[in-house]
């Protein structure tokens, strides 16, 4: 995929989910054939998000944590501080026009493999599942994934648990799976080394390498 354009990476810090969601929609609706593909790195304050396939019964208990009905794929998940969210705003249609063999499934696979490779940097064996998108360690889920495609362009992305309070996951069936256990990087390495600031550059670099982007701006 040597024809891919440079990838612009934006660090958004900590931002409200709905604010960034609206910005993603605006960006996608307004982009043209010359708009650079982008990655947005962000952490969200505590929020449950329901995907398009989400069912109300997967929220097991009402809490003070807000619930947002999102337009991404998938079911319910939780976002909180200490979780690295990476949104991918990629013009899939343009890459096909450039002659690159590029589709939604390949984008999903690249996201999952980027997480697998990032965790391998820490000596951790992780893997995707063909029947349940995301990344797992010993049957526990460490990364959730959901995309939306509009006008041939992707938005939304992945959420990788780094060093966070996992207890809100007990109030839901994560990604629609009853009893699914969640885990995080801090469970496997020195928690002092498990930070979004340390992990994000590795995650971006692996994603860019997998898809052949020729530059990143971090």
UniProtKB/Swiss-Prot annotation:
Its EC number is 2.3.1.181. Residues 33-215 form the BPL/LPL catalytic domain. It comes from the Bacteria. InterPro entries: aa-tRNA-synth_II/BPL/LPL (IPR045864), BPL_LPL_catalytic (IPR004143), Octanoyltransferase (IPR000544), Octanoyltransferase_CS (IPR020605). Pfam families: LplA-B_cat. Pathway: Protein modification; protein lipoylation via endogenous pathway; protein N(6)-(lipoyl)lysine from octanoyl-[acyl-carrier-protein]: step 1/2. GO terms for molecular function: lipoyl(octanoyl) transferase activity. Substrate binds at residues 72-79, 144-146, 157-159. It catalyses: octanoyl-[ACP] + L-lysyl-[protein] = N(6)-octanoyl-L-lysyl-[protein] + holo-[ACP] + H(+). GO terms for biological process: protein modification process. Keywords: Acyltransferase, Cytoplasm, Transferase. The active site is at residue 175. Transmembrane segments: none annotated. The record marks 141 as: Lowers pKa of active site Cys. Belongs to the LipB family. Catalyzes the transfer of endogenously produced octanoic acid from octanoyl-acyl-carrier-protein onto the lipoyl domains of lipoate-dependent enzymes. Lipoyl-ACP can also act as a substrate although octanoyl-ACP is likely to be the physiological substrate. In the reaction, the free carboxyl group of octanoic acid is attached via an amide linkage to the epsilon-amino group of a specific lysine residue of lipoyl domains of lipoate-dependent enzymes. This is Octanoyltransferase. It comes from Pasteurella multocida (strain Pm70). The gene is lipB.
């Amino acid at each position: 995929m040597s024809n891919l354009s440079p990838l612009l990476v934006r660090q958004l810090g900590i931002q409200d989910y709905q604010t960034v969601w609206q910005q993603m929609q605006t960006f996608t609706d307004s982009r043209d054939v010359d708009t650079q593909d982008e990655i947005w790195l962000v952490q969200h304050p505590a929020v449950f998000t329901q995907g398009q396939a989400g069912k109300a019964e997967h929220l097991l208990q009402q809490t003070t944590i807000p619930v947002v009905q999102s337009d991404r794929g998938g079911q319910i998940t939780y976002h909180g501080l200490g979780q690295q969210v990476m949104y991918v705003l990629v013009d899939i249609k343009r890459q096909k026009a450039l002659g690159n063999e590029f589709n939604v499934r390949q984008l999903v696979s690249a996201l999952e493999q980027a997480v697998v490779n990032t965790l391998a940097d820490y000596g951790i064996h992780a893997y995707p599942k063909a029947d349940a998108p995301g990344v797992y360690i010993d049957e526990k889920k460490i990364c959730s994934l959901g995309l939306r495609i509009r006008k041939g362009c992707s938005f939304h992305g992945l959420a990788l648990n780094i060093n966070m309070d996992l207890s809100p996951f007990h109030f839901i069936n994560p990604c629609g799976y009853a009893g699914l256990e969640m885990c995080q990087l801090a469970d496997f390495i020195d928690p002092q080394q498990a930070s979004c600031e340390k992990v994000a550059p590795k995650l971006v670099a692996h994603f860019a390498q997998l898809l052949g982007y020729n530059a990143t701006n971090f």
